[in-house]
Amino acid sequence: MAKIKPLVDTDIIIDALKGIKPARDLFRRQEIDVYCSILTRKELLSKKGLGSSEGRQIERMLSKVKILRIDNSIQQQFTNLLQKYGDRPEAVADYIIAATALAKNLPLLTRNRKHFEHIREITLSPVYKVE
């Protein structure tokens, strides 16, 4: 059986770190290879007031993830998205995440669906609900 390969947004990793079961289970399943953007790593580790214990916990979680660096294909997709959808400063990070999903042909798993629904080129994976 082929592995499931989602690109997770920062919120999914934060949920897993908080112990939210569907997110936590995602990182434990053998049939799933979890990917994230290098930007997600930066967002997690540059949190204001991040303590060393929390930083280690984040690094442990990230050790279970394939981190994708920004390469030429991602840069090209990012440029295409900016040209198509406009250059809004608040959306740059989202466009990098979307460009990564697009360039690597990975479905995006995020609870921040409103940030990505207008980008028709990417596939948004169904996501769990947090109560």
Language model: regions and residue ranges:
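Alpha-helix capping/helix-boundary segments
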Residues: 12-13, 40, 74, 96-97, ...
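Nucleotide phosphate-binding site architecture
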Residues: 13-14, 45, 117, 125
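Short, well-structured N-terminal submotif of metal-dependent ribonuclease cores
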Residues: 1-36, 46-59, 131
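Acidic, metal-binding active-site segment of PIN/NYN-like and related structure-specific nucleases
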Residues: 98-131
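Generic structural signal for small/hydrophobic residues in well-ordered secondary structure
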Residues: 9-10, 44, 78, 101, ...
